[in-house]
Amino acid sequence: MAKEKFDRSLPHVNVGTIGHVDHGKTTLTAALTRVCSEVFGSAIVEFDKIDSAPEEKARGITINTAHVEYNSTIRHYAHVDCPGHADYVKNMITGAAQMDGAILVCSAADGPMPQTREHILLSRQVGVPYIVVFLNKADLVDDAELLELVEMEVRDLLSTYDFPGDDTPIIIGSARMALEGKDDNEMGTTAVKKLVETLDSYIPEPVRAIDQPFLMPIEDVFSISGRGTVVTGRIERGIVRVQDPLEIVGLRDTTTTTCTGVEMFRKLLDEGRAGENCGVLLRGTKRDDVERGQVLVKPGSVKPHTKFTAEVYVLSKEEGGRHTPFFKGYRPQFYFRTTDVTGNCELPEGVEMVMPGDNIQMTVTLIKTIAMEDGLRFAIREGGRTVGAGVVAKIIE
């Protein structure tokens, strides 16, 4: 049993295990909960419970994910582990479980494998900011030179995808040993403790939504006689205060305006904060100057764009997606925040078609601008039906 109640005062950080099948991601996840329960008093979660993760639906896509939590001395960690490779792809692209940092599990006995590479690439594409490496199954490797070789390979692979390979912390150990409470050559519990300490020191505390620059996707626009124009929506991040200058970005040319009031539940407030549904009263903005799909932002914080590269997951037939592949020149709607915009898809060189259930990098050109940043999630739709999910990897123009 857990020794203490959930402590809200500790900063909260989201992490997850990534890496090739059978390299020990789930064993390490279970070992983390065990070691942290002994050292820091959080609850133990058994391997079998993590391995039989329940199905979840994120944007209509079926994903199996296990969520566990554990504490270090200074933080509370929420940790995701996926049983299958396809679940990782979907999870990372939809942002169902966003990670502030990832633990790359690589078997010291096998070295980097195809999914090791693919998960590092996915992490780069979807904007996972930090990776820490756990070289697992080190108890099965007698040769110190072999360990060094695998470590070098992993560092090279990280550098290939623009992670700081030379400076990435690599912990060598055995998750199975730690799970069994053993610690020969400090490869068991000591290594896992060291991993937790590394998470504490290497992954910076994420900037809370409320401390980021203000952004609210506009869902609806009203005109109130004698008061002016009100836009409503859920504030995604930051704070808006009365008299704040604001910009309206996307779909048309960017315009500037001023907040003259914030309303929630028909009450007037001095400010609106991240996570709240509210109406923002705008000075000098006409009802027809603004529409659903635009965003209200702190001036200069977000720019409108039309062309970007994306990492996309195409729904399978079973998930209600397309039954047939699509080809180059495919023109679906891209649903950003609150609206659909038509766009053209350019496939990578040598790729002729994309099958349902695939994940693919593509370059998209929209017919209208959208307020966009790297890491922004979107859905791909055909006539209102979701057929894919994606994330902006890199803005081009």
Swiss-Prot record:
Annotated spans, G5: 174-176
One GO CC term on file: cytosol
Coiled-coil regions listed in the entry: none
Any one Gene Ontology molecular-function term assigned to this protein's record: GTPase activity
Entry annotated with the keyword Membrane: no
Region (G2) residue spans: 60-64
Chain residues that bind Mg(2+): 26
Binding site for GTP: 19-26, 81-85, 136-139
Renumbered residue ranges of the record's region G3: 81-84
Region described as G1: 19-26
Alphabetical UniProt keywords: Cytoplasm, Elongation factor, GTP-binding, Hydrolase, Magnesium, Metal-binding, Nucleotide-binding, Protein biosynthesis
InterPro entries recorded: EF-Tu_GTP-bd, EF-Tu_GTPase, EFTu-like_2, EFTU_2, G_TR_CS, P-loop_NTPase, Small_GTP-bd, T_Tr_GTP-bd_dom
EC number: 3.6.5.3
Regions crossing the membrane: none
NCBIfam families per record: EF-Tu (TIGR00485), PRK00049.1 (NF000766), PRK12735.1 (NF009372), PRK12736.1 (NF009373), small_GTP (TIGR00231)
Subunit text: Monomer.
Family statement drawn from the similarity comment of this UniProt entry: Belongs to the TRAFAC class translation factor GTPase superfamily. Classic translation factor GTPase family. EF-Tu/EF-1A subfamily.
Protein name: Elongation factor Tu-A
Lineage per the UniProt record: Bacteria, Pseudomonadati, Pseudomonadota, Gammaproteobacteria, Pseudomonadales
Gene: tufA
